[in-house]
Structures are given as C-alpha cells and as structure tokens.
C-alpha cells in the first residue's frame, strides 16, 4: 500500500503570488483550467495501490478548500484529507508532526511533493527505480538538469553516475556544485522518520542551551537543508533524473508558463480539454482550454497557451494570447490581452490593450528554467506579465503595459510599468 503527501504551505507563504493569492489559496489557483494541486492529485490517482492522499499546510480550512477536496475525492476515487499545521513547520516538520497519520495502515512507501511545482509527475517510474535501489531502506529525489547559473537557485545534487546514489546535497549553493537540481518530489520509505527524529532531537538539544528559545522551533525541520545533506553519501539517498518538463510556480508570471506546459501535456493526457477551431466557433491557435460555461464570440482569436475560466465572456474581435482569464471576467469588443492574468470578475473595455512581458526560460538553452525575478531591479519595476486582481475595471481604448493592478480598482487611463495599489 502507498500514500502521497502534498505540502501546500499557507497564507504567509506564496507572497510572490499576490495579488492572485488574496482571493484563493495558492494551491487552488487554476492552471490550465484546473486547480494547481489537482494536477498532483490526478498523477497520484494513477499510481496502482495508492490508497490515500494527505494535504499538509497551515491554511485555515475554508469552504473553497473543503469543496475542492470533496469534488476531487469523488472524481479520482481516492481518499483525500487535509491536515492543518499549527504553524509553518517546514517541509520535514510537517510530515514529522503528522507521522502517525501518514504511517496508519502501514504503507510500504509514500510520496512527498511540493504543491508549487509543475511536472509530468513520473511517479510510477520513481516507484520502479526505488524498488531497484534498496527499496525499504532507500529514499528517492526526483531530479532534473539545469544550466550552471540557474542551478544556484535550487537544491543541487552530486550523484554517482553509475548507481545514481546522492553523494552530496547543497541547498542553493553560493558557487556551482552540480547541474542536477531537486524537483521537490520525493519517494520515502517509513524509515525516513528515524532520520527526521535525529534532527528533531538535535534541535531539542540546541534549544535547551538557549535561554529564550521557543519550543515551536524544535519542530521546524527542513527536509532539504536538515535531512538530505546528512543522508547524502550514506548509501540511502538516490536521485531519479527526469527528462520531462518541470517548473516551479513561485510567482504569478510562472503560472502562465506552467499553464503552457500542462496544456501541451493535455494533447496526450486529456485531448477532450483542448478546444479546436469549429465552424461557427472562435479561431483557435495552438493549445487552448475553454470552460464549457464560457461565452466566446465566433470572431475572437484565441491562443496559443490560453486558459478561459468559468462564466467568462469574450466579445467580438477579441484577441487573447499566452494568458489566463479567470472566472466571470468580461473582455469587451476588440480588446487585446497578451501575456496577462485577468482576475476574477474583472472587465477589459472595448479596444483596450492589456499586455505583459513573458518571463519564459531561454528557448535556446534546453536546460534553462524560469527565472524568479525580483519585483524591482535598479529601483524600477521589472518588466513581467500584467496581472489584474479580482474585480478590476479597465476603461475603453487604454493601454495597460507590464503592470500589476490590485483588486477592486477602477482605472481611468493608461498605465505602464506600475503597481496600482
């Protein structure tokens, strides 16, 4: 029997995802038409003998989360539960805190994945690899290749070329260590908890030496820095390298890139989700997802990489490319939306142009990853995708370029390279 744990974080995390995370917990943000974490759940449901999925985070349980879990259980026919941490305990602290729930029923192994990654999730291949490399006494990290410069932004893995054993692990090193990076998806045997317990006891001893220490800090354990670095070179930790697409979803801009990766996967996994040009329907270019309840005028041109949410209205002559249009938004006649996320119930006026700058990886480098740009560079806003928060109104015939508009704003003129508070 197998289980899966998905680490979904909490409201204090994912701040780079604002203003989109104001309205909905980041793991429920729609990427390629379905909530981000649903891609993980679907991948888990395809693993034979996987009986339960546990979501661990420190969001307060709310209606959106509860109804999503209920729908997902019915759709994927697998038990799904949410376990709430009392505070942010780190990637290792969360699973250690809920170790009894994870181990109940006696799973032989369990997956642990971060909710903010986009991947093909080669879980069955990881399972086969795990059986060949030590089984119950070994642990597997999913790895991929990055270029030398960008590898410094991730956990770097030095592995034995023949056996794939992890010899050395460094989280975000200061200088180049390895071009194999950690994808944030793991397969553990239950014995991993012995190693996490060692870190817990070590934290306990260190805190006893400090006078004003808080007991909560004892439970804050990071898998990457505290556990993997000590397990490396001990014959227990292995890396399974994937050639498939992979990306982090840290900033709102990376959601558009992740949407592109998932839409391209739909060609083989869910062809029914992709729209096509039909007589009397809109012109579709490339991969496009349109929710069945959306109302799209036949003269509109959509794609590539466009995701249209529930109840969206796309009027005559509208052009949309490389964008996510969320629930209830209205795009009026002849508006143009490029490299933009249009928030829930927002309105783009007639002949208005809303455009951003894509933050894509370098297309000439096969190992390039998406850069997590800082919001400001040299005192100026870094050009990135345009984001309209929830319930934003853009008047007719204006241009909004490389800007972030916070929720409930009614704009009256054009803006360029600004954050509109």
From Swiss-Prot:
Its EC number is 2.7.7.13. It catalyses: alpha-D-mannose 1-phosphate + GTP + H(+) = GDP-alpha-D-mannose + diphosphate. InterPro entries: GMPPB_C, Hexapep_transf_CS, Mannose-1P_guanyltransferase, NTP_transferase_dom, Nucleotide-diphossugar_trans. GO terms for cellular component: cytoplasm. Transmembrane segments: none annotated. Keywords: GTP-binding, Nucleotide-binding, Nucleotidyltransferase, Transferase. GO terms for molecular function: GTP binding; mannose-1-phosphate guanylyltransferase (GTP) activity. It is an enzyme of class 2 (transferase). Signal peptide: none annotated. GO terms for biological process: GDP-mannose biosynthetic process. It comes from the Eukaryota. The keyword Acyltransferase does not apply. Pathway: Nucleotide-sugar biosynthesis; GDP-alpha-D-mannose biosynthesis; GDP-alpha-D-mannose from alpha-D-mannose 1-phosphate (GTP route): step 1/1. CDD domains: M1P_guanylylT_A_like_N. Belongs to the transferase hexapeptide repeat family. This is Mannose-1-phosphate guanyltransferase alpha-A. It comes from Xenopus laevis (African clawed frog). The gene is gmppa-a.
């Amino acid at each position: 029997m197998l289980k899966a744990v998905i680490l979904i974080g909490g409201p204090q995390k994912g701040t780079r995802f604002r203003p989109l995370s104001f309205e909905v917990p980041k793991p429920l943000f729609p990427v390629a038409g379905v909530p981000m974490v649903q891609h993980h759940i679907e991948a888990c449901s395809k693993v034979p003998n996987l009986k339960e999925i546990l979501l661990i985070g420190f969001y307060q349980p709310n209606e959106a989360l509860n109804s999503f879990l209920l729908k997902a259980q019915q759709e994927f026919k697998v038990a799904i539960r949410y376990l709430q941490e009392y505070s942010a305990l780190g990637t290792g602290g969360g699973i250690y805190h809920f170790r009894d729930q994870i181990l109940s029923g006696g799973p032989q192994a369990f997956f642990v994945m971060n909710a903010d990654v986009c991947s093909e999730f080669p879980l069955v291949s990881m399972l086969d690899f795990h059986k060949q490399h030590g089984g119950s006494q070994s642990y597997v990290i999913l790895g991929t290749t990055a270029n030398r410069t960008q590898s410094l932004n991730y956990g770097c893995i030095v592995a034995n070329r023949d056996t794939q054993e992890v010899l050395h692990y460094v989280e975000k090193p200061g200088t180049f260590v390895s071009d194999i990076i950690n994808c944030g998806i793991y397969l553990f045997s239950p014995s991993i908890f012995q190693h996490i317990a060692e870190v817990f006891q070590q934290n306990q001893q260190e805190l006893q030496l400090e006078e004003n220490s808080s007991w909560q800090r004892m439970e804050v354990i990071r898998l990457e820095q505290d556990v993997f670095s000590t397990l490396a070179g001990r014959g227990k930790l292995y890396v399974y390298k994937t050639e498939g697409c992979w990306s982090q979803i840290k900033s709102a801009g990376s959601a558009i890139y992740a949407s592109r990766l998932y839409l391209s996967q739909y060609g083989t996994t869910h062809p029914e989700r992709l729209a096509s040009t039909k007589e009397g329907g809109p012109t579709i270019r490339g991969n496009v997802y349109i929710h069945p309840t959306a109302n799209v005028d036949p003269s509109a041109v959509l794609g590539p990489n466009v995701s249209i949410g529930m109840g969206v209205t796309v009027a005559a002559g509208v052009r949309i490319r490389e964008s996510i249009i969320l629930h209830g938004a209205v795009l009026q006649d002849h508006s143009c939306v490029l490299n933009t996320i249009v928030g829930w119930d927002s309105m783009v006026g007639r002949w208005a142009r809303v455009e951003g700058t894509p933050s894509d990886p370098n297309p000439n480098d096969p190992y390039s990853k998406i850069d997590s740009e800082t919001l400001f560079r040299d005192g100026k806003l870094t050009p990135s995708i345009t984001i309209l928060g929830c319930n934003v109104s853009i008047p007719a015939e204006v241009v909004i370029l490389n800007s972030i508009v916070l929720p409930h704003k009614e704009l009256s003129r054009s803006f360029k390279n600004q954050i509109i508070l």
